[in-house]
Amino acid sequence: MQKLEIKGGRKISGTIVISGSKNATLPILASTILTNKKIIITNAPILRDVETMVGLLSTMGSTIKLNKKEKKIEIFNHKTLKTFAPYHLLKTMRAGVLVLGPLLAKYGMAKVSLPGGCAIGPRPINFHLDALKKMGANIKIKNGYIVASAKKGLKGCFIKFPKISRCYRKYINSILLCKRKNQIKKLCFRA
């Protein structure tokens, strides 16, 4: 591991502004589906994936104000949202699957396009789908879409990952509204 060592006789002080994280902003945006209250996200990095997620939520019925200069996103879900996330909006990003859990938790159904391309390479979503199935969701893959329902709602359960995972946000989104205690094992919270 590399380090930067500064030697000198003077004390260094000051402040820096840390930019927001795309990988934190995307699940936060998806989780706004769960509330009808106005949500304001500040210090949001306005990158292509964030703009795509904003476009998806807008298409689903969210009222959204995006201020690129202030890096601020205001979201208000004052009406019932559509539970359909089309391919043409999700073909360029993987994070579209993040809306699946909140849609199931709030509306009991969802039809979400399978994730689009990723520069890192293929990253399966089977852990996410298996966890939702364990929580009571009925999930089928039809014509490139995840078709899911949870007519009795999502139920808490014990989830053991087959390996350590950094994709905990997906699961946290899904389990927040479950009616009983949840347990997840082998979950890594390192950045």
Predicted ranges, named:
Residues M1-A191:
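Structural preference for solvent-exposed beta-strand-turn elements
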